[in-house]
A protein has these predicted regions:
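Active-site-adjacent substructure of cysteine-protease-like catalytic cores
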Residues: 37-61, 65, 98-149
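Short, surface-exposed, charge-dense and proline/glycine-enriched linear segments
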Residues: 71-82, 121-131, 152
Length: 159
């Protein structure tokens, strides 16, 4: 099974999906979900609506001997806030059993809906090896499944 990245694709239901590269996967995916539903809202606007700016200085936690500073909120919070503030009805599901997760993904994409997925970047075969690390907060869009695997749009990648 392979995973193919796209730039422009016609979905099973006849709609056209256009890939947009984004500064961050979460805001890019959130923007794509709203565009798919007819609300043409940019990634920077999602960042603002979702309160993406955050600052924290943690002198009591050190990495390589230096205190940690952060400039973004926890993964998923921008999406959650933007969806709530824009009045979106969101269905979220978590799966401990990989097969149940794949079965549900296939069920939903067969209806013609695109699906946002959050997963660990380390295991993504399409992701450049130098960027792989254990981080279970990477987001991308699954468009549909074909005979070779899944067609996806990952806003963190150029195409």
């Amino acid at each position: 099974m392979t995973t193919e990245l796209i730039t422009k694709e016609t979905l099973a239901n006849g709609r056209t999906y256009i890939h947009h590269t984004a500064a961050h996967c979460e805001t890019g995916v959130t923007s794509a979900l709203f565009r798919d539903k007819g609300l043409d809202i940019s990634e920077p606007m999602i960042f603002g609506i979702g309160s993406g700016i955050f600052f924290g200085h943690l002198p009591f936690i050190k990495q390589t001997g230096l205190p940690i500073s952060t400039f973004r909120s926890i993964p998923g919070l921008v999406f959650k806030k933007a969806a709530k503030r824009l009045g979106a009805k969101v269905f979220r599901k978590r799966f401990r059993n990989p097969q149940k997760g794949m079965d549900e993904l296939r069920r939903v994409i067969r209806t013609g809906q695109i699906v946002a997925v959050t997963t660990n970047v380390y295991w993504l075969s399409f992701f450049p090896r130098r960027y792989r690390f254990n981080f279970s907060g990477h987001n991308f869009i699954v468009l549909y499944e074909n005979e070779n695997g899944f067609r996806i749009s990952d806003p963190a990648l150029l195409e």
